[in-house]
């Protein structure tokens, strides 16, 4: 859980204390998930945990990037680079950024998998800001822009692992309407019962 600075302390001390606590929690999570991450295949071993609470979907994704921490944070600190990453997903149609005094205004346009003009897609408006950036810990957030409470919050943190590797943690939440929860539960109870992500599990497979 990412912490904010506590009241009653000097601003610099508050930020440093919160960053130290968050880094310690990220390191503890990594040690717990390391066996799963190290078993992963591909260029970026990945572990995803999801849960639901009061109709809200909560997700945590952890990945090991085979790139030095300095290069990773250099890329992530600039919101414009997010517009090179996020549209790689098939549902993302476009991404724009505009500088603001409180951070960078970032707009994502999401729609159906097939071709769809950005003007027909749904816009999610965010303010992107970096909370912490030092040699051992990085944290940033995408928060709903003023007047757009429907944009789900996203928090990102990273830390170096050594050996030119970087641990990335993305936390997100999403509140869905009742009709969509019923439809989703019905799908995963029937047609999607053997699916994890995009993969179909074999009958004898174990979920790790």
Regions flagged by a language model, labelled:
Residues 62-64, 129, 157:
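Generic structural detector for well-ordered beta-strands
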Residues 56, 91-153, 160, 173-175:
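Glycine-rich portal/gate segments that line the openings of hydrophobic small-molecule binding cavities
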Residues 4-12:
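C-terminal segment of classical bacterial N-terminal signal peptides
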Residues 15-42, 46-47, 52, 143-145, ...:
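Terminal "cap-and-tail" regions of soluble proteins that handle hydrophobic small molecules
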Residues 79-80, 120, 188-191:
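Surface-exposed flexible segments
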Residues 86-90, 99, 121, 130-134, ...:
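Glycine-rich loops and low-complexity Gly/Arg-rich segments
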Residues 15-105, 111-118, 208:
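Hydrophobic ligand-binding cavity/cleft-lining segments
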